[in-house]
Amino acid sequence: MHVSFLTRLHALLRNRSGVAMVEFALGTPFLLTAGLWGAEEANYALVNLKISQLAEHLADNASRIGDTSTLQNRRIYESDLNDVIFGAQVQGGRKINLYDNGRVIISSLEVNSASKNQYIHWQRCRGLKAYDSAYGIQGQDLGAVGMGPTSEEVTAEPGDAVIFVEINYTYQPLVSAKFLGSLDIHSIASFTVRDSRDLSQIYQRNPNSPDPVQTCNKYTGNAVISTNGSFN
């Protein structure tokens, strides 16, 4: 019996029929992990690109808005800015959910006529994320510096304005946050206002029925357009 057991043991040790299956079982977790990590990294890169494009489109669109009068500088209205803000939500789509997962800050960088310094004339914000502008708040005097990262600041010319947009967004993992470091995506963009703009204020089209103002003390998620066309 002892000899029979040894014979069977030797036969088992020489048997190679299950090697491939064992190797597959051992290697599959590593291959699966690598595949999921690659998918997460690719999705993160795509979302990063999308947020960057949204920042550019917001700044570009906000620099173009206004009425079409040829007799005076173009006025801009709260409804114009609401359209720009809602347009970014539509462009981002449900996958991004821009205002539920992030925050947009639109600033009008101008030159103070009295001090000749750069200052933020007005800001409009939207989004649930608790984030304040990294470059200043409404009414802040910026001296001669302007807005933007150190040594890369943009400045406005006298009588003109620069629309500066910041987006701070929390990435929503496709698989798991453990595959990534920080989930925060930050993007900025700026465009000089295209036409001669009335820089005195942002107007209401109908003062008796004013449109919502997206002030930066509010933290509101994705916008909803009602059946009568009103914007919340």
Show the residue positions of the predicted features:
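Short, motif-level signal for alpha-helix interfacial/capping segments enriched in acidic residues
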Residues: 1-2, 167
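Intrinsically disordered, low-complexity regions enriched in Pro/Ser/Thr/Gly and acidic residues
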Residues: 89, 100-193, 200-211, 220-222
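Short, low-complexity, Pro/Ser/Thr/Gly-rich segments in the mature regions of secreted, periplasmic
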Residues: 213-232
